[in-house]
Amino acid sequence: MKIFFKFLCLFLLFGCSETTFLINSAKRIGSWGDEPIYKVGNPYKINGKWYYPAVDYQYDEVGIASWYGPGFHGKTTANGEVFDQNKISAAHRTLPMPSVVKVTNLENGLVLEKVRINDRGPFARNRIIDLSKKAAEELGFIKNGVAKVRVEILEDESRKYV
C-alpha cells in the first residue's frame, strides 16, 4: 500500500508540473486578441506575382496608398487579428506583422506617426500600402480613395514585437 501511495503522489506531482508548463507556454505564445502575433511570413503568390516577406528596418518608400474597410470589417487579418476599419492599421505586402510605420500624405502634408501593419496587401497595381478607413480619414484622402504617400518603418517600435 505504501508503494502505491508513493507512486500516486509522484504521478500527481508530475501531472501538475506538466500542466504548469503548458500554461506558461501559452502565455509566451500570446493570443489572437490583445497581444499581436509576430510573423514575417513565407513567400506567397497572388495573381501570378510572388511576394517575399522580410525584415527590412531601412524600409522607406514613396508610392500610392489606398484604403479598405467595409468589405473587410470584422474579418480576420493575415496575422489572425480581427480587422476594425475604425482603428488605425494597415496592410503591406512584405513587412513583418506587426510592424510600425510612419505614413506621410505627400499631397496635403498630414502625417500618421504610428501605423501598425497587421495584414497583407494591397494587391492592386502601383500601390504600396492599404490603410484602414480610420487611417485614411486621418490622412485626409477618404474621398479620393488614394493618395501619394511616404511610408517609413519605425525600427524601435517594430522591434518591440519581435
Language-model segments: residues:
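Secreted/periplasmic proteins
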Residues: 16-162
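Short linear, low-complexity motifs centered on an aromatic residue
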Residues: 1-2, 64
